């Protein structure tokens, strides 16, 4: 309840069976929600480059094979130089293989992890933002035209106009980006995705409220006082974007 946006309505005593919604209910209104699921792999954007790369390798090097497989998968052209001794990398101030060098820009890329981070696929946040805006408008419309089996559910929906946006395929995204599930970069990507979703939904909700007015129980809620969901966690959150 400390993190509820319905603190002005009453105490929430339970969730639904799947626990994906936490809303207020009483004998006069039964909480329901209008949900949509976003398939995150649809928003993977492949990285393209026309730069010419040089991949320094040596015989019987598994990481050398892996970096070449990665570049092939990304459709990035390169030429391979198989070195006989590590001293051949001295001009580049590097002592391990594989080593990738960007000839076009005349700069070093680095080893396998550096190459993956530089040329891996990314999340198209602009497309995700646009999708969430559309979903928010659609879910808002569903509230008005939906079939309600009992009047208590309709009363709840009309008073609070709740919507929920979830995701699927986050693990698939990490696989496509070749990122460890528990790595710091995976955690940041996760935060960035939901930051985009939250912002886009709030932005569209504001646009709708400008035309239709706020929902009935808006005034007195945390959001009506400028307290967003991340403000209710008792922690400092700083966006890096």
What are these language model-derived features?
Residues 69, 73, 172, 207:
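Surface-exposed charge patches
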Residues 103-119:
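Non-catalytic, surface beta->alpha helical segment in thiol-disulfide oxidoreductase systems
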Residues 48-81:
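Local sequence-structure signature of Cys/Sec-based thiol-disulfide redox active-site neighborhoods
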Residues 35, 78-80, 108:
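Conserved beta-strand scaffold positions in the cores of enzyme catalytic domains, especially
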Residues 1-50, 120-155, 169-173:
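Function-dense linear segments that define catalytic or interfacial modules
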Residues 162-180:
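Hydrophobic/aromatic-rich, well-ordered segments within soluble, folded domains that form packed cores
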Residues 131-154, 158, 162, 180-241:
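Internal maturation/activation junctions in enzymes
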Residues 79-96, 101:
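Thioredoxin-like thiol-disulfide oxidoreductase module
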């Amino acid at each position: 309840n400390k993190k509820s946006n319905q603190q002005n309505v009453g105490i929430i005593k339970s969730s639904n069976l799947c626990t994906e919604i936490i809303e207020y209910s009483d004998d006069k209104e039964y909480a329901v929600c209008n949900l949509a699921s976003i398939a995150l792999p649809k928003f993977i954007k492949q990285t393209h480059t026309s730069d010419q790369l040089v991949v320094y390798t040596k015989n019987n090097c598994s990481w050398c094979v892996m970096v070449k497989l990665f570049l092939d998968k990304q459709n990035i052209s390169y030429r391979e130089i198989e070195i006989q001794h590590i001293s051949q990398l001295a001009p580049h101030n590097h002592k391990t293989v594989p080593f990738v060098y960007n000839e076009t820009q005349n700069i070093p890329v680095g080893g396998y992890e550096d190459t993956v981070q530089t040329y891996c696929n990314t999340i198209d946040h602009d497309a995700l933002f646009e999708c969430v805006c559309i979903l928010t408008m659609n879910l808002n419309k569903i509230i008005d035209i939906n079939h309600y089996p009992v009047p208590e559910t309709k009363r709840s929906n009309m008073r609070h106009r709740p919507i929920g946006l979830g995701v699927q395929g986050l693990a698939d995204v990490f696989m496509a980006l070749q990122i460890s599930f528990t790595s710091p970069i995976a955690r940041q990507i996760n935060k960035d995705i939901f930051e985009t979703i939250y912002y886009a939904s709030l932005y569209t909700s504001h646009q709708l409220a400008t035309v239709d007015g706020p929902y009935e129980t808006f005034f007195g809620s945390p959001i009506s006082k400028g307290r967003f969901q991340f403000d209710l966690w008792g922690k400092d959150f700083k966006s890096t974007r």
